[in-house]
Amino acid sequence: MAVTWLRLEARRRWRSLVVVALLVALTVGTVLTAVAGARRGESAFDRLWAVTLPATITVVPNQPGFDWSAIESLPEVSATTLFVVQDGELITGTGPDGSFSSDNLGFPPGGPGALHTVERPVVLAGRMSVDSRADEVVASAEFMSEHHLRVGAPLTIHLPSPAQAEQSFDPTSAQPKGPLAQVRIVGVVRSPFWLDGPGSGGGVLPTYAFTQKYSQYLFGSDLARTSVYVNALMRLNGGEAAIPAFKADLARVTHRSDIDVWDNYQKFGGPVKKATSYEAAVLLAFGLAALLAALFLVGQTVSRYVADSAEDLRVLQALGLTRRKAVVCAGIVLGLAAVAGAVIGVAAALTASRWMPIGLAAYAEPHPGFSADWLVLAVGGAVAVLLVAGGTALLT
């Protein structure tokens, strides 16, 4: 009987069934995109943190010639990478829109292992640079987007002269007088410390071989007079919990209490997580509003469909059709329409995941592009079908 009823309804009222399927598809696609996008955005920084060997702390004595050997050997320290703090270079290149210049050269590595043992970034495109190659750099996604570049693009780094480097040369106020270093972008990367932000312009990270090759143009030729200094990123045994013990040992071995130690998760992750939590709440609110509106629209459509079918079902009941079978007949037709709509909606949500997450979370997402949150998609699709089928049963 149910199969016969399905054939009759599909032939007579296919337009109404298509409307139900489309409404369900629109509802499922919109709500699941919002919910999955909210979950993905809120977890973006933590997922980036989990896969990049992030530095627990940044140690910033800001002192030229600082001796790191005693600090690196402290029992709390698991791994260290040093970075040079200076900003005397100018980067030029050519993109689709013509020539461009930028002063966003990231902190050059001050020792081996940078981008490998600490703050090992996820590679969004291309590959990681090779430490021994002075002509290779990696760039942030924002830098690539800002200048419309692709992996393999050549850049020229205008270095200051040794005398300029010693005096913290500003490339925006005068022309660098050092050599021109020809480099090529081999990859696009992202990590918590090297995180982009809105309007930041992104940056380029050279290798340790670059630092070694052009050392006198970064530090100057007289290290006793230079104003350039090296700070450190460190991973601690025990993570954040080990920071107080590290600070105590740092003060003991340096005989200084004025050295800043940043808790990287709080300093870099705190503002990002605050923003992404707000963005997730907005997306969830949008999804809830869409759901409430859809419940009204779908409910009205299902109610009209059931009312139109009631007369035919009453005739069949007079001929011996039980109430239970009548409910099954009505439910199976709308249930199949809901299944079709749910499948389309889930497919739409999967497609929309390419543009998620949005806002600040997009800058922290370790795996941008297509992403399937199967928990949300499966549960959401199933609930949509059950609501339509259950509503039909109650109204019949």
Please name every model-derived segment.
Residues 334-347:
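Hydrophobic alpha-helical membrane-insertion segments
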Residues 344-354, 395:
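C-terminal TM-helix exit segments that contain a strictly Trp-centered aromatic cap at the helix terminus
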